[in-house]
Design a protein with these regions (language model features):
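Short hydrophobic core segments
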Residues: 12, 35, 134, 150-163, ...
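An anion/pyrophosphate-binding glycine-rich loop and adjacent beta-alpha core
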Residues: 39-41, 46-47, 55-59, 179-183, ...
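A conserved short coil-to-beta-strand element within the FAD-binding core of flavoproteins
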Residues: 130-142
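A glycine-rich dinucleotide-binding beta-alpha-beta segment and adjacent secondary-structure elements
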Residues: 130, 300-380
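Glycine-rich FAD pyrophosphate-binding loop
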Residues: 26-50
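Glycine-rich loop(s) and the adjacent beta-strand/alpha-helix scaffold that form part
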Residues: 154-197
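Glycine-rich active-site loop/strand segments that organize a redox cofactor
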Residues: 50-97
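N-terminal Rossmann-like FAD-binding beta1-loop-alpha1 element of flavoenzymes
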Residues: 8-34, 398-403
Length: 408
């Protein structure tokens, strides 16, 4: 009989964390059943990274997880990004990374990652119970009973969070065990604004530097692509800052705005000098003044915001008008009224209180044999592979912890 064959483990949730935990356990011969609410496992995994699956980030560190650095450190020490990459390569899935350290499957398809995990589970005789909405998990004697009928020695809660999930209620499963969820909010999602300029620029993208302010005080700065849409700011730079907005809102902060620098490569005086030179040498319409620096439509909107008609000749612009234009190029302010809804978010801020779990094993401090991993815990990271890195590392740590228990 294989090592650990007598131990039965239930994993509630067939996402990234649950599946890699199942693989880790199955490899040691442990009897594993994955319960999944959807008709198949890994549905959310298919949508990550715009369908390409940003699996991890080469530069991921515990400090990239807001106030959770100390908690996630043991999982990262045991299973850093390179370890998770090796896990997949050993099973035939090869990867590539970009200049930002983001790691993707070589196929550029999220389905390749899901197939790798699913097929490995099948090879290891992991059972899938799909279209199974787990309503109750109860402690009876030394066992955990799922939905009043199936008994297990250990249970792993890997249900994910509220982001992109309809009718999420999995936090309640842990309530009978004394585990409560913290306040939650959507993260890695668009920023909502009441500025009409966004509607005029719908679909326009620009490489910018963007600073988030709360009551006028700078809170965070990110650089990357900004995408305008109806009364919202999207793109990776906005999604990054949405995490800070959500964390700050949960801590009681409000009154948010963002300052967008459309020409981050140049300081104010250099940009003013360039614009002054361009304006002095051309009788073209002012609408063309900024077209060599940013998308033309953005330039026109900035002119109008400065109270300047795009129709007047450039060489009629006064120095104070050029200073106003330069100032808007370097700091265009948008009031932020909210972040997008859970249905559009990639990650949840908050979750089951991590302080009730041992960071070295992810086992409950309240009930032996109960574990929690992935997004279900109140851990969230930056945009760019950091949250899947946590899912994979925490799922593997849960599995390894249970394996150690099976040897006692």
């Amino acid at each position: 009989m294989k090592e650990g064959a007598l131990m039965r483990v239930a994993i509630i949730g067939g996402g990234a964390a649950g599946l890699i935990c199942a693989c880790t356990l199955g490899e040691k011969g442990i009897d594993v059943t994955v319960f999944e609410k959807n008709d198949r496992v890994g549905k959310k995994l298919l949508s990550t990274g715009n369908g390409r699956c940003n699996m991890t980030n080469l530069g991921a560190m515990p400090e990239d997880y807001f106030d959770s650095a100390e908690f996630v450190a043991p999982a990262f020490q045991k299973y850093p990004p390179q370890s998770n990459i090796a896990f997949f390569e050993e099973r035939g899935l090869y990867t590539r990374s970009d200049s930002e350290g983001r790691v993707y499957p070589l196929s550029n398809q999220a389905s390749s990652v899901l197939d790798c995990l699913r097929l490995e589970c099948e090879r290891l005789s992991v059972r899938f119970s799909c279209s199974c909405d787990v309503k109750t998990v109860e402690k009876k004697g030394g066992s955990y009973v799922v939905n009043g009928k199936d008994a297990f020695d250990k249970v792993v809660f890997a249900c994910g969070g509220r982001a992109s999930v309809k009718d999420f209620n999995s936090y309640s499963l842990l309530a009978p065990f004394g585990h409560k969820a913290t306040k939650t909010a959507p993260s890695l999602v668009r920023l909502v604004t009441d500025d009409k300029m966004t509607k005029q620029l719908k679909g326009i993208r620009a490489a910018v530097s963007m600073t988030l302010c709360s009551k006028g005080k700078k809170a965070a700065t990110e650089s990357g692509e900004l995408l305008f849409s109806d009364f919202s700011l999207s793109g990776i730079v906005s999604m990054e800052l949405s995490s800070f907005v959500s964390h700050l809102k949960l801590s009681g902060k409000n009154d948010f705005s963002v300052e967008v620098d459309f020409v981050p490569e140049m300081h104010f005086e250099k940009l003013l000098s360039i614009l002054s030179d361009l304006a002095g040498r051309s009788g073209l319409k002012s609408e063309n003044l900024l077209s060599g620096l940013m998308p033309k439509k953005i330039g026109i909107c900035l002119l109008k915001k400065a109270g300047i008609s795009p129709e007047i000749p450039m060489n009629t612009l006064l120095q104070n008008q050029l200073r106003d234009i330069t100032a808007l190029c370097k700091k265009c302010v948008f009031k932020i009224t909210d972040v997008g809804p859970y249905s559009q978010a990639q990650v949840t801020v908050g979750g089951i209180n991590r302080n009730d779990f041992f960071e070295t094993t992810l086992e409950s401090k309240k009930h032996k044999g109960l574990y929690c991993c992935g997004e279900m815990l109140d851990v969230d990271g930056k945009c760019g592979g950091y949250n899947l890195q946590w899912a994979f590392s925490s799922g593997r740590l849960c599995g390894e912890s249970i394996i150690r228990e099976s040897r006692k």
